[in-house]
Amino acid sequence: NVKVPVANRLHKEGKGLNVALTCLNYGRCTLSSGILGAAKKARDQATKWARTRYQFNRPLSDFDLVQEKIARMAAYTYAIDAMLYMMTGMLDRHDSDIMVETAAAKVFASEMGWQVIDDAMQIMGGEGYMTENELERAFRDARIYRIVEGANEVMWSFVFAYGGKQLAEQMLGVQTAMFYDTDENPFENIGRMVTNALNPAIMSRAIPLGLQLVLRIKPKKPVISGYHPDLRPFADRLAKLVRDHSHWFKLASMKNKEHIVTRQTIQARISDTAIHLFAMSAVLSKLSAQLRAGVRGTEFLRDQAAALHFFEMAELTINENIRALNKNADRSMREAAKAAIDHTDTLSDGKFYISERSPVSAGNGRATEQQHIKQFPGGSQLEMGDGRSTDAEVEVKPRA
């Protein structure tokens, strides 16, 4: 136990975790900006390659499947840019609680940024692996972003849990107030339910929730404002998707009950939908600003087409996520995973690399071979002597 003087506290007592988590907000934004820069460079490089590389006497950009990748790269880079601009604006405004938003931005940027760079590699083919074309470094570096600053699997669960906290509390409150409790006798149950039924504050929450959960009646669409008039059809589509997400989130929570806490596939679908809705909102905002500013030219036309294409793709993704809440392959997935795990357990640990932190097999795995990896002389540190060493003296050479 470490005693910290009051004068050295960074915040109020008991708020240490909140301070630590808040620091992650900045890291997730700077990480996302790095992804965006690499994705934009990859987009432009691959698109230029597709225009100048010919196959069958035609540029690659003439082919549908290449055009699909070009459009997707443009759409995702525009969406990442829009989301990051909105996110950094929240930081500059000193908004107090934006952990969900920064987590969503990190997940979206790392997933879609990776897709952009992967598409660029596919367009450039084997040339993409050539160091001189400056894409292979971006391809290698981009993969780590889905792991660092919170692995995306963890972030999906975080967005689900933290973002859905208010809904969960509301549903639990209504259930406690109006549902039958087996721990109470019948008279206590009736008395509690009648008393709460006469409470306007409780019924104002219980009736709309009951209409959705019991009668499956969807609520009204939310009102979206501030967009450019030309984008009203897209704002209406976004409002409908927000309503559908809220409705099916409630139904999924009722269907899975307490099991939803451990079913990460369901959590990921709900989180991914919320993240795409956030991205669509950011895209709508950015495109509205461009239209109001009277931006023109080929770059704007590219941005406008990319934004509208992203809306189409995001809508398809959201509808698929909603459909998969009820019809999916989760059961066979768990069975297949269990069978694969059971088989792997029969294989000797000595044939495989095992985590040094494994509580069950540390030290039993295959030894790592490092002869082919360049090592610094002098062990783990590069010894520079008196500071007057020549280049030859500090040249990195592989071990014999």
Question: Where are the model-predicted features located?
Answer:
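Flavin-dependent oxidoreductase catalytic core characteristic
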Residues: 3-387, 391-400
